Amino acid sequence: MVNTNIRPDEISSSIRKEIEGYTQEVKVVNVGTVLQVGDGIARIYGLDKVMAGELVEFEDGTVGIALNSESDNVGAVLMGDGLTIQEGSSVKATGKIAQIPVSDAYLGRVVNALAQPIDGKGQIPASESRPIESPAPGIISRRSVYEPMQTGLIAIDSMIPIGRGQRELIIGDRQTGKTAVATDTILNQKGQNVICVYVAIGQKASSVAQVVNTFEERGAMEYTIVVAEAANSPATLQYLAPYTGAALAEYFMYRKQHTLIIYDDLSKQAQAYRQMSLLLRRPPGREAYPGDVFYLHSRLLERAAKSSSQLGEGSMTASPIVETQAGDVSAYIPTNVISITDGQIFLSADSFNAGIRPAINVGISVSRVGSAAQIKAMKQVAGKLKLELAQFAELEAFAQFASDLDKATQNQLARGQRLRELLKQSQSAPLAVEEQVATIYTGVNGFSDKLKVEQVKRFLVQLREYITTNKPQFGEIIRSTKMFTEQAENILKEAIEEHIELFLLQEK
């Protein structure tokens, strides 16, 4: 028989212990209800105290961002497809804003807009995080741009130089080689101690894979992070991708390193933002873009900077890409981004189709930093180049109507055609600065005038090889002194004269 002798004092003491151990903890959660969901947008009732840009979490685990606070509901954009979110389900405010983990381990990886790996190489270890949207450096924490960011493309480094901490727009129609200019610049940073971030927004996954492939083949992934949101990604993630890229680049910039970030391209980000805004029923403005589309891009591009010496002189150079329709630079997004950036590289479809590649229109491309972002050697040889090309373009237009031209004009036209050849380069073949100096010197000083126009490009390729193998001291002088000294000029003249004889003999 079971002993049923229960002692009341034992019961009361155990109850007393339970009561003493009880902590009255009230957890306040801001909860709302889904009124409507669809097209990547959710309207939520409740959530009274939600902040603009705060993350909200749905019952199925989907995360959204609260963007619209109206009198009776909150409009949130979803960071997923939202197919399993049901009307009437609950939503809770997280009290956080969008943040991403950051670390050196991101180098060589392909991630999405939430900094999650999408390259199948496993998780990325990270000990700290940064907000996706962070304020741009103030005036005191910046200094003026003075170091060159070499792109490896003669046309840019000689006439439209880019400096570390500058924002240089690459603009042109589709299929004019905008991405090629950007990727060549990344390839040229090998060994320059520059961290590169390539942000692909709303592109075909195959195009992104091709770019990543090129980087891997050329060993550029060692210092590059790729942030990709393909065309089939939700608009919210396409809109966030550039800010994620900027946050990753800032992590390195504030650690006294130099970074280069490419946004490919901001037209697609603006379209994703327009889609979100229209679905949130925000009033449309010009070209149906919302009123704050300028702020969308200005707050992104203002994060590029050259840090002051107190902050360690790190830098973040931004190259946004914008696509134009039929060369119309006066559309809304192109004019906005032109006014925010420190210059633009304009790629023309006509030049591209005429076989001038990179198809840079030197006439209307500018760099508002200018020669401050060039080494002395480049300033010395490239000074006359832009002027000569501009005069040639003017003469060429005139020569179409005139039949008999005097000898001086014919010579100027011949020189101009050869200078145009000198600017042509193959894709993924960036040139070191000493090779560029040698190439420009050859053209500007008339050494290539003896050659036929179609021989110029081949001659210059061989000349660069000849100098590298037979006159290595030329490259050493330019690299060490950053100046085009008299000694360097004599070595170069000698090399050109020797090689021109060889070349003309071979061609016969």
Swiss-Prot record:
Alphabetical list of Pfam families matching this protein: ATP-synt_ab, ATP-synt_ab_C, ATP-synt_ab_N
Please state which protein family the record places this protein in: Belongs to the ATPase alpha/beta chains family.
**GO molecular function of the protein, one example?**
ATP binding
UniProt function note: Produces ATP from ADP in the presence of a proton gradient across the membrane. The alpha chain is a regulatory subunit.
> What keyword terms does UniProt attach to this protein?
ATP synthesis, ATP-binding, CF(1), Chloroplast, Hydrogen ion transport, Ion transport, Membrane, Nucleotide-binding, Plastid, Thylakoid, Translocase, Transport
Q: What does the record say about its membrane topology?
A: Peripheral membrane protein
How is this protein named in the record?
A: ATP synthase subunit alpha, chloroplastic
Q: Where in the cell is it found?
A: Plastid, Chloroplast thylakoid membrane
Key word Transport present: yes
Entry superkingdom: Eukaryota
The UniProt annotation places ATP binding at 172-179
Q: Where is this site: Required for activity?
A: 365
